[in-house]
């Protein structure tokens, strides 16, 4: 079973985060204490691509697990993010560009004159919600939590419904001129060193049951495969299946009685010899 995928909706004018981190504790509903230790750990989701349409990545996963080369080229063609250019009035105007907006990296620290804003980067927090628009439970929406507020970003479908409602009521649209993109984060088997900036933290209390069960099933399958390849594990199983594995090392009753009589006879001979000496 493949690991779940996270999707984050953000404004095109904002920079994406390079990775999302999730730290899970032990699940009290797990059957075995050994399995609970397997489920606990830190998970790393790496930014793989940025899309303009939210249904492109999901469509590829519904059709086949491995996209073709043509699909990959089409995906990269959608990852072109529009850049901002100011007009005479100082108002940012969205214009198409061939340059892709990239998150700051460690190499950018030496090239930028003012790194104070980057070094003071505070890790944004995300909460995970189910994605009811897909048939599979692999893709989940990660909603960014606003700093200083308890409300979350609206769901992509809920956002479109609100915009449609406001447009029918002839009300002004506050975000009608803003473009949005979708960042796709895939789980990585190898967790690198946590960067000092440009990463997000997932709230462990907001993990849906389907998301957590997907992680747990993947860990269980990996644990079973590793146990099968372990020769020591096979040797222990073979010994435990043997009848003599559970037998104690105590002597039989007849052997114990014979040894006791021999010891008593030897003790009496020694005592008699000491008496005559």
Swiss-Prot record:
One of its GO terms (biological process) is protein import into nucleus. Residues 222-277 are annotated as: Disordered. The keyword Endoplasmic reticulum does not apply. It is found in: Cytoplasm; Nucleus. Residues 251-277 have a biased composition (Acidic residues). Pfam families: Iwr1. Residues 225-234 have a biased composition (Basic and acidic residues). It comes from the Eukaryota. The keyword Transport applies. InterPro entries: Iwr1 (IPR040150), TF_Iwr1_dom (IPR013883). GO terms for cellular component: cytoplasm; nucleus. Keywords: Cytoplasm, Nucleus, Protein transport, Transport. Belongs to the IWR1/SLC7A6OS family. Associates with RNA polymerase II. Directs RNA polymerase II nuclear import. This is RNA polymerase II nuclear localization protein iwr1. It comes from Schizosaccharomyces pombe (strain 972 / ATCC 24843) (Fission yeast). The gene is iwr1.
